[in-house]
Regions:
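A helix-coil-helix interface module used to build multimeric assemblies
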Residues: 2-212, 219, 223-230, 293-294, ...
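Alpha-helical transition-metal enzyme core signature, strongest for iron centers
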Residues: 37, 88-92, 145-152, 182-196, ...
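A conserved active-site cap/scaffold subdomain adjacent to cofactor or substrate pockets
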Residues: 247-282, 286-287, 291-348
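Long, amphipathic alpha-helical stalk/connector segments used for oligomerization, subunit docking
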Residues: 308, 312-399, 403
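Glycine-rich cofactor-pocket loops
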Residues: 157-179, 285-300, 331-340, 364-379
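Active-site-adjacent "gating/activation" loops or surface patches in catalytic cores
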Residues: 222-246
């Protein structure tokens, strides 16, 4: 057995490996170790910039050599650290020993004890994890979400003038435009994307219990709060939580996962609507030679992309829900439950990324069946009742709603002929009758909202 997709337990690394491999640099074990190395190195460099008395003579020409330790971090480096962890039984301590080994090779033995100086492992984890989370979302997740939004907008524009029967409670309702119905989803996604982007990527950096005890006892003259704010906010590009226990309180992380979950929920809504439109024959799907829809029924062309997307989004949301509910809770100054949970953050993001790609594929295969849409609209003349009774209200006609209810709320089919016959029975002017007869399901569409 090896690490090949065929033997992976999780489908995100197995069946869907080709769709998720871009996330490995951020959310794999290798990725986490590399980000820990990055934080340790940049922290050491920040100490030389103060400079601490013992680091005043640190050779400036070695700064970039230190950065190369994470820039050129290899799988062999990660394996060395994992092997060391077998002895230490502590993942962050193994990273510290790796860096000391590398610094020794660079001839920097004098400065070894300022690696991980004054820190606890959570100062590294609670900066490395949000940094990996931020960069993975910025680099992989958001561009894919933008692709989904762009595709919806493309179809929204293409189909902006297509009249369509709306359905509320599954029943025929006032007509709408297909493009506008897609705009609903696009607008919702854009709003939730803005909410997501506004959530800070928070980090904890303050020593064993958040008080800078070790830093302060060694160098009480240094403003460690100001130093740490600059290091976390400016050097790492994160948002330092000011007052903490041993760990980040994860309140912003919970907000982030909730925002990611809302985006997925909107896409589930879209997937289900498109699936339903396909079942109603509003859409055909582009055929691909060689593909099979059913092992038993040769005719089947199933909306599998939207089903795949919906399934993956549901799994992702279950995990996001646990992350946002669990992470802000930790016993006293810290328990270890956050550690194992944080290791799973890449999993719901991976399922989301798989879903985005499936939705994109499905949207790209849609072929509009205008004939079916038009036929259903024409078969539902009852929907013009709202328009007729509203115009009659305008004219002061007595009980127009009740009059139209008598026409339409029956088991008899309402047609253009029956509507026009009803209009002819009304005691109104010929001009008003003519106005009412011009109202049709295909033109009773309200305001054009696409492009507004």
């Amino acid at each position: 057995m090896n690490n090949a997709p065929l033997t992976a337990i999780s489908p995100v690394d197995g069946r869907y490996h080709s769709k998720t491999k871009a996330l490995q640099a951020y959310y794999s074990e290798y990725g986490l170790i590399r980000y820990r190395v990055l934080v340790e190195v940049e922290y050491f460099i920040a100490l030389t910039a103060i400079p601490l008395p013992s680091l005043k003579d640190f050779p400036a020409d070695q700064i970039e050599a230190l950065r190369d330790l994470y820039r050129n971090f290899s799988e062999d480096d990660a394996l060395w650290i994992k092997e060391t962890e077998k002895t230490t039984n502590h993942d962050v301590k193994a990273v510290e020993y790796f860096l000391k080994e590398k610094m020794t090779a660079l001839g920097l033995e004098r400065y070894l004890e300022f690696i991980h100086f004054g820190l606890t492992s959570q100062d590294i984890n609670n900066t490395a994890v949000p940094l990996s989370l931020k960069e993975g979302i910025d680099t992989v997740y958001l561009p894919l979400l933008d692709d989904v939004i762009a595709k919806i907008k493309e179809l929204e524009t293409e189909w902006k003038d297509v009249p369509m029967l709306a359905r509320t409670h599954g029943q025929a309702a006032s007509p709408t435009r297909l493009g506008k119905e897609l705009k609903v989803f696009r607008e919702r996604l854009e709003l939730q994307k803005a909410t997501l982007i506004a959530v800070p990527f928070s980090a904890k950096f303050g020593g064993a219990t958040g008080n800078f005890n070790a830093h302060f006892v060694a160098y009480p003259e240094i403003d460690w709060v100001n130093f740490s704010n600059h290091f976390v906010n400016e050097t790492l590009g994160l948002h330092r939580s000011q007052t903490t226990t041993q760990i980040e309180h994860y309140d912003h992380a919970a907000g982030l996962f909730d925002a990611l979950k809302r985006i997925n929920t909107i896409l589930i809504d879209l997937d289900r609507d498109i699936w339903t439109y396909v079942s109603m024959d509003y859409f055909k799907q582009k055929l691909k030679a060689g593909e099979i829809g059913s092992s038993a029924m040769p005719h089947k062309v199933n909306p599998i992309d939207f089903e795949n997307s919906e399934g993956n989004l549901g799994i992702a949301n279950a995990l996001y829900e646990h992350l946002s509910a669990k992470l802000p809770i930790s016993r006293l100054q810290r328990d270890l439950t956050d550690s194992t949970v944080l290791r799973t953050i890449g999993v719901p993001i991976a399922h989301s990324v798989i879903a985005f790609q499936s939705s994109l594929k499905g949207l790209g295969k849609l072929v509009l069946n205008e004939a079916a849409i038009s036929t259903e609209l024409e078969n539902n003349w009852a929907v013009v009742a709202e328009a007729i009774q509203t115009v009659l209200r305008r004219e002061g006609f007595e009980k127009p709603y009740e009059a139209l209810k008598g026409l339409t709320r029956t088991h008899d089919k309402v047609t253009k002929t029956s509507v026009h016959a009803f209009i002819d029975t009304l005691e109104i002017t010929p001009t008003l009758k003519e106005e009412l007869k011009k109202i049709e399901p295909s033109t009773y569409l309200g305001i054009q909202l696409v492009g507004k």
